[in-house]
């Protein structure tokens, strides 16, 4: 396996399964870099995007990449539309997909009106998170609980699309996600629904502890939407159940592989990556028994979310994000990195 890695010392670069890591192009020429990687590999390889920017680049340059890689025949502009949260909101409105009410914020007047109409808390999202510069302390999605949090967001709004969404109150068991792989006819060859048990940050963040469970409504909604869009390839969609309406709001649509894809590993060992590899290389996908009840935990973030309560989950989880008995080095690198960041943060606070 080859991969484009953001940093040479990233935990993923330590995996024994990574034959070679390649640096992201600083000039942004992803096609040239991927072509060079293909020459190193020496034969057609399945290409999977792990972030939105990668998914957009692969879809929009598919004609140039297809001689070197096995990739889904995706509608070229579709991943950009789905990853851009402003365009996604417009698409949901056009298709009648249930979603939280969304406003584009261009300045203080828009922000004040949204706070008045939506109330607090509300959800703030940067429409194109892959364009956010590193090191300025902005999260892709954040929960605005107090009015005095708004000015800091507005400091960075020039040249960027900031969205405010009405907050959908979520109780226990209200957050769900769907991961699936869709063929050239937008038929789901493999997929499943998972329930987000814990997240970081709480209420509007990544899954730190999740469980594979059947949910016909979430599964049906995701499959129906993919069919309407003519979607092909891997996707990851987030939903929140609104008990007041008994409806599932679509919160996010990631046109690429989701971080917790290994949660959905069935009795035969099939998962989303293997399903994609089999299909794109012209082989049949034979599904085993669904692993309903399987759990997945992200060690470092679940500790931040649940503290000591997370230890039981980490000990019993069927799938861990970092630790693997046959490949422990990524976990060790992650732990070192987390401790280094913690000590750095502590030193700054004491300075």
PLM features per residue range, with description:
Residues 227-262:
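Conserved metal-phosphate-binding beta-hairpin within the catalytic cores
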Residues 197-209, 254-269:
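Glycine-rich phosphate/pyrophosphate-binding beta-alpha loops
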Residues 275-351:
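Peripheral (often C-terminal) accessory segments that flank ATP-dependent C-N-forming ligase machineries
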């Amino acid at each position: 396996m080859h991969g484009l890695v953001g940093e040479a010392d990233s935990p993923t670069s330590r995996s024994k399964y990574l034959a070679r890591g390649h640096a992201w192009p600083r000039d942004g020429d992803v096609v040239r870099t991927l072509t060079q990687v293909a020459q190193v590999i020496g034969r057609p390889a399945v290409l999977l995007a792990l972030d939105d920017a990668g998914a957009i680049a692969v879809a929009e340059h598919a004609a140039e990449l297809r001689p070197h890689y096995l990739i889904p025949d995706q509608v070229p502009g579709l991943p950009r539309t789905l990853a851009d949260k402003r365009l996604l909101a417009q698409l949901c409105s056009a298709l009648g997909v249930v979603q939280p009410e969304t406003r584009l914020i261009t300045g203080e007047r828009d922000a004040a009106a949204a706070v008045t109409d939506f109330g607090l808390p509300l959800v703030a999202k940067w429409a194109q998170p892959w364009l956010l510069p590193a090191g300025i302390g902005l999260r892709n999605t954040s929960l605005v609980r107090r009015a005095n949090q708004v000015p800091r967001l507005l400091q960075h709004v020039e040249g960027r699309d900031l969205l405010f969404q009405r907050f959908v109150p979520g109780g226990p068991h209200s957050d769900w996600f769907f991961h699936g792989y869709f063929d050239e006819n937008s038929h789901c060859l493999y997929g499943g629904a998972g329930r987000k048990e814990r997240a970081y940050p709480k209420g509007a963040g990544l899954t730190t502890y999740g469980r594979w469970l059947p949910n016909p409504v979430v599964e049906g909604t995701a499959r129906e939407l993919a069919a309407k869009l003519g979607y092909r390839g891997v996707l990851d969609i987030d939903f929140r159940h609104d008990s007041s309406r008994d409806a599932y709001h679509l919160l996010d649509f990631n046109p690429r592989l989701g971080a917790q894809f290994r949660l959905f590993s069935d009795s035969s060992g099939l998962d989303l990556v293997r399903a994609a590899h089999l299909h794109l290389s012209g082989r049949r996908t034979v599904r085993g028994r669904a692993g309903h009840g399987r759990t997945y935990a992200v060690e470092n973030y679940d500790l931040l979310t649940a503290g000591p309560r997370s230890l039981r989950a980490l000990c019993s989880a069927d799938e861990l994000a970092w630790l693997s008995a046959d490949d422990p080095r990524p976990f060790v690198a992650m732990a070192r990195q987390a401790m280094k960041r913690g000590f750095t943060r502590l030193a700054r606070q004491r300075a």
